[in-house]
Amino acid sequence: MPHLPELSKQEPSANTLVDNYRAKGEDLENSHHNNESRLAEGVHYDRNKAPALQEREKASTEKVNVEGGGASSSMVDNIRRGNPSGVA
């Protein structure tokens, strides 16, 4: 019958599974000490490899005046009074 699973396939032994688990653990431990993998994980970065960070750090903010400040303050007052639409 074609719809039945293949029962002759052998599952890996417990020792094989434990060895695979240990090998993965060692790989993770070794990759933690590797700077390239730490860069990928975001734990550590090198400024030469991340020039966008340098550009962002150079960016500055400046205060600007925005016209129409009175309208926004009246809107805040309307919201405080429980009338968010501003309709009287």
Swiss-Prot record:
Superkingdom as given in the UniProt entry: Eukaryota
Biased composition, class Basic and acidic residues, residue ranges: 21-65
Keywords: Stress response
Induction conditions: Up-regulated when grown with elevated levels of potassium chloride.
BP term (GO), one: cellular response to osmotic stress
Renumbered residue ranges of the record's region Disordered: 1-88
Function: Involved in osmoadaptation.
Record protein name field: Uncharacterized protein AN4029
Species assigned in the record: Emericella nidulans (strain FGSC A4 / ATCC 38163 / CBS 112.46 / NRRL 194 / M139)
